[in-house]
């Protein structure tokens, strides 16, 4: 139930008690800051610059402007994104690969391995809607290659029944999965693969599993 009530809060008086810092301590702290900056900048310098991105795009038959934003946003994960696009080019799926990348957040671009993206790209009907079916992400879960797993594990008869009537998938999730809210701490979920294997989930993981299964079946 929702409710509200007035609260009158008086914040405590500020009484900061900062320690004295000697000139030598300040100098050492500055040295450490500079060292940290140099390490970070050296790492950033390994990211592909615009000419390298343009050359990569040409090598896979794509327009530089189409891939530059994704590669820049992927930062230290650029090799994985480029590998994904390279594989898509070999299979003639560059346009579809870009549609998939467009569904991802910048954090996903920085975190997701090429193999996970490939699993979703190559195991989804080419005519399926990108935002509602091709997209790997459901909520705030870690992205996994659940699509090929569920397509392989869900019995053919069940898959056919779920496609004919998606409400049967709803009923299966309700009746076949045991709710175990104590399994997940705040902001963690069970992967769709884990839910299938264990037949147990908290409510959010069950919801994610349902969407993952529906997408895997092309619903």
Identify the residue ranges that each predicted region occupies:
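Hydrophobic transmembrane alpha-helix bundles
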Residues: 210, 218-219
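Short Gly/charged-rich anion-binding patches and loops
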Residues: 168, 208-209
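N-terminal accessory/pre-domain segments preceding catalytic cores
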Residues: 1-182, 189-197, 215-217
């Amino acid at each position: 139930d929702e409710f509200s009530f007035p609260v009158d809060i008086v914040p405590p008086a500020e009484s900061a008690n900062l320690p004295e810092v000697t000139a030598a301590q300040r100098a050492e702290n500055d040295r450490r800051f500079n060292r940290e900056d140099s390490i970070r900048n050296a790492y950033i310098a390994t990211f592909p610059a615009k000419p390298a991105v343009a050359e990569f795009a040409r090598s896979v038959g794509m327009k530089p402007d189409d891939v530059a934003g994704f590669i820049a946003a992927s930062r230290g994960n650029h090799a994985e994104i480029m590998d994904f696009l390279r594989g898509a080019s070999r299979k003639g799926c560059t346009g579809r690969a870009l549609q998939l990348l467009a569904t991802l957040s910048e954090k996903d671009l920085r975190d997701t391995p090429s193999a996970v993206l490939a699993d979703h790209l190559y195991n989804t009907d080419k005519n399926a809607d990108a935002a509602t079916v091709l997209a790997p992400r459901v909520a705030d879960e870690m992205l996994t290659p659940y699509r090929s797993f569920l397509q392989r594990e869900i019995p053919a008869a069940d898959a056919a029944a779920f496609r004919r009537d998606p409400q049967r998938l709803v009923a299966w999730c309700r009746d076949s999965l045991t709710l175990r809210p104590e399994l997940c701490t705040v902001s963690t979920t069970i992967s769709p693969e884990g839910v299938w294997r264990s037949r147990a989930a908290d409510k959010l993981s069950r919801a994610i599993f349902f969407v993952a299964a529906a997408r895997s079946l092309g619903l």
